[in-house]
């Protein structure tokens, strides 16, 4: 498994790589620049895994506020960022139900629907985690989904969890099997939105946009449409400012 996973990941990254680099890094850098211009204060970005590293970036800032771009809190993401912070550094723990974040998500989906029409089914896919110890995370994911559905005035939607690996039980239902089941039951066109990812990345572009789409089509579906993440949408940059100032 250890021999195969790096090669498999490299192949997947090749499918979504841009001339500017990793989509996640590109979008995050742009968000930081736009927020800096909007707030007229120093704004820097860092990566939990990779460069620029969190600790090295913190050394360049006075009285920093850290905003992990994980809307829903979990021990495996947000908490690991907190573990790296020196004493006294402030951090936003979560923003899964922040009105500006929900409004940005809703505006993003509406913009896509205005341009491309609305699919017959709406599926909200969040990053999965092992089920044990993830009660808070799951609750916040489902709360985000409910608030987004309310903002969109959608009565029927599905919540699923992706990115599972290994043999332990993860949060259910799983995204790809759910899509196959939908296709087998006659669903022809499904819209997928990933509210837990604020930037398009490997998990959205490849895992949903390529692999899950293929699984859906192979099972008899006609069209799986991936709604882009928030990326550099003006509503999201505004939401980031409101989250930071709260």
Model features per residue range: what roles?
Residues 1-246:
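Active-site-proximal alpha-helix that buttresses catalytic centers in soluble enzyme cores
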